[in-house]
Amino acid sequence: MANIKSSKKRSIQSEKKRKYNSSKKSMIRSFIKKVKNSILKKEKDTINNSFIEMQSILDRYAKKNLIHKNKASRLKSRLSKKIKFIFK
C-alpha cells in the first residue's frame, strides 16, 4: 500500500483508468461480435448499420490509444472482406 499522498492519488487514478479502459475494450469486443453474428446469419440490413457503428468506435478508441491503430484497421479490413463476400 502506498504511504505517500501523491502515490496514493496515483494508485486511485490508475485504478479508475483501468476500469474505464477495460469497460471500453469490452464494448469494442461486443460490437465486433455483433457484426460477426450478423455476418453468420447473413442479415444484410443489420450488417451495414452495425459495421458502420463498429468502424466509428474502433477509430475513436484507436485515436485515443486504447487500441493500436493497426489493430483497428486490421479488424475493419477483415470484416469488410467478409461483408463484401456476402454481398456478391
Swiss-Prot record:
Under the heading InterPro entries, the entry gives: Ribosomal_bS20, Ribosomal_bS20_sf
**Record-annotated membrane-spanning stretches:** none
Q: Does the keyword rRNA-binding apply?
A: yes
Top-rank taxon of the source lineage equals: Bacteria
The GO terms this record gives for MF are: small ribosomal subunit rRNA binding; structural constituent of ribosome
Which residue stretches does the UniProt record annotate as biased composition, category Basic residues?
A: 1-22
Give the record's keywords alphabetically.
Ribonucleoprotein, Ribosomal protein, RNA-binding, rRNA-binding
Q: Does the keyword Acetylation apply?
A: no
In residue numbers, the region (Disordered) covers 1-26
GO BP term, pick one: translation
Q: Which GO terms describe its cellular component?
A: cytosol; small ribosomal subunit
Annotated SUPFAM superfamilies: Ribosomal protein S20 (SSF46992)
Per its UniProt record, what Pfam families does this chain match?
Ribosomal_S20p (PF01649)
Record's family? Belongs to the bacterial ribosomal protein bS20 family.
**PANTHER family registered for this protein in UniProt:** 30S RIBOSOMAL PROTEIN S20, SMALL RIBOSOMAL SUBUNIT PROTEIN BS20C
The record's function comment reads: Binds directly to 16S ribosomal RNA.
HAMAP family recorded for this chain? Ribosomal_bS20
The protein depicted here goes by the name Small ribosomal subunit protein bS20
Which organism is this protein's natural source? Wigglesworthia glossinidia brevipalpis
- The gene designation is rpsT
